[in-house]
Amino acid sequence: VLLSASFVSYVGSFSKKFRDRLIVNTMVPFLKKNNVPMSEACDPLVLLASPATVAEWGGQGLPADRVSIENAAISVTAERWPLMIDPQLQGIVWVKEKESNNNLQTTRLDNKKLLNTMEKCLEGGMSVMIENVQEALDAVLAPIIARQKIKKGHNFFVKVGDKEVEYQCVTTL
């Protein structure tokens, strides 16, 4: 479990080659040295995604290669919302299909209705995809991206611009 948690937390931005080296040369030796119990064939993906889940993702358009499956497992498991660098648009196709039942809304940073879309999705528990993100994000999105929730009574709120919008925990970004 610790290896899988470390995998989700640290390897998402690395290449397949570097991920493998990090696991084999750093993470596994560290865990063994500290007597953390684990199976001989320790594969973080085994705990992160069952074969049925991987098959479902494949049916939703996710490519069957190991890196795509690892990236998908990281994106659905991580506490933070993923930033996908997707020049071949394979991940976008998968996310759109995967989230189609969650009333996925797509928008862009230059869309004049961006904040309205974000408010609607946060309040309605809908998924939202911001496409073509460049190097800088608008600061008004920082509380949303960081999930800076404010608890009032039994409800959570997130600051969107100058408003506090009720946050439904099922919202995905």
Language-model features, listed with the residues they occupy:
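Conformational switch/transducer regions in large eukaryotic molecular machines and scaffolds
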Residues: 1-173
